[in-house]
């Protein structure tokens, strides 16, 4: 890597983009400092000196949000950053996906990409700056990488597409799209949308790709200027004679028939047995520990299985479970299967099954998101769990990993556009999707199960959502798009393209690929095929439950809304929160107060809500001119008496208004503690209340 500082500048969506090399982190294989507006990200790429054993490419992408970047001190006892939050994890996955396919096949060195956000301007996306930084760090390093790539955000406002919309623009945008790719094709898409059409989504993707091409050209100019020397990487060549011998044995022992097994577990068992039989042919009795040969045979067998699966799909249009390319697995769904929960939905598609369970809470049960931007109160959450038993395996039980966080967030993104506004449904909603069985497309099963749970719970959603995962097998001169992919097709195919939406349009998409990129033709066809599949699944779901229930569960909390004048909020809260805590302690309710004076009262028992409402009404009650009250004498002065109309509100009863008869002293007719009926005659501009008993005598 060059040790001399170099600075390169361009413009990106109306803001300055600067890439600096040669000054920071010089012991990394590659490092760049990206400045986008006031956002600053340090991106580094480091590779191990020796390759790792195994069949996978050990790439790790990290994205770290430093709280000082936004002028904040971390919360908690230690006052320092802990493990990455969900948003940071999702960004790391977002960067990983377009980069991973562009390393040479067979490259097994550990590669670690680190992105540190040093300064954060919410209007200049740190996430997209980190994606460009990751691409540049790899491109200027000696690590073999077939980039560069770039990524952009795309918004859609009033029929117009916008590159890298600001925070304010995102609030009104119908689309929140992240798209990445290289000069020739798109290789990553992720989006949340408010029911936009397939054509609108397609146009958005390739509108973004036009900007990506310009950014890739800019990066290539930097690479050409720096001229990094890349590591020499020579892939390991297979022994062709050995490959032919193994291939002959697979044909002899019926690889095609073994692959074409409907049941996943039976297929896996049959493949394991076939591999074991073939490997036994190569075990030398005099050298039973010939591990290198055995390892090579297993690697060849795995490649031959992959080739056979792809050949069957591409040439014979037959999938491992016997389906046609556009055929969906058998569907089954139920609702209301858990009696004490607030809502539940069980969705099964072939050998993939998700149980989604919904819980309603008060608005105060929101999740507080404290990241680099302003604090956010999230009142809809979707969490995804993938236990080992879902794939018939054992293993340690750990906290949710990157995959679980990513799938949960995708489901949340797909559903959040149909969640009713607070004014219409004043609840916090949490859905947990438990994957009970998995053979591919479990994230989309969780979306379908969650829609069923929402309707079972009586949440007045705007429209039901269904999800489906599309696959792809490419040949040199042809391709086959698959509807509703299973696990083997995901692992051995070229694409996992998830699409969720209503009958009217798309609410979320996510695309991962293992090839260099996708053409417009493939993406357009995949979107249309996904639409047809989504509608088929939707029709099945609506046969189970066609609209939200009209009543909530008996075990769900009840929430009542009332409104007070904003200047009365302080009276309800009291000094140091004393009054509101007294209400909560006495009634057991949950209270949430908005700045406009809206109060949400939540509890399981309606009587508790009624009591809390009575207390608040008493606190915020106001005197009205012309109304009569049974008042209590609280203080006596020479000129009259101060009487309490109700808690928190006193009035002056002037000596001349006590009686129609002349009174020399107030004490002659009133003493502290007496009750007297009064009528309100005046409330002045300062809110002072004047009362009269005399008016009632006349």
From Swiss-Prot:
EC top class, as a word: transferase
Alphabetical list of InterPro entries matching this protein: ExoRNase_PH_dom1, ExoRNase_PH_dom2, ExoRNase_PH_dom2_sf, KH_dom, KH_dom_type_1, KH_dom_type_1_sf, NA-bd_OB-fold, PNPase
Keywords annotated in UniProt: Cytoplasm, Magnesium, Metal-binding, Nucleotidyltransferase, RNA-binding, Transferase
PROSITE patterns (alphabetical): KH_TYPE_1, S1
Reactions accelerated catalytically: RNA(n+1) + phosphate = RNA(n) + a ribonucleoside 5'-diphosphate
Domain KH: 557-616
Cofactor(s) named in the record: Mg(2+)
Biological processes annotated in GO: mRNA catabolic process; RNA processing
Xref: Gene3D superfamilies: GHMP Kinase, N-terminal domain (3.30.230.70), K Homology domain, type 1 (3.30.1370.10), Nucleic acid-binding proteins (2.40.50.140)
Keyword Ribonucleoprotein applies: no
A UniProt-annotated Pfam family: KH_1
Record bears the keyword Magnesium: yes
Binding of Mg(2+), residues: 490, 496
Cellular localisation: Cytoplasm
S1 motif domain segment(s): 626-694
EC number: 2.7.7.8
GO cellular component: a single term: cytosol
A GO molecular-function annotation: 3'-5'-RNA exonuclease activity
HAMAP family registered for this protein in UniProt: PNPase
Entry function: Involved in mRNA degradation. Catalyzes the phosphorolysis of single-stranded polyribonucleotides processively in the 3'- to 5'-direction.
Family listed: Belongs to the polyribonucleotide nucleotidyltransferase family.
Protein name in UniProt: Polyribonucleotide nucleotidyltransferase
Organism of derivation: Staphylococcus aureus (strain MSSA476)
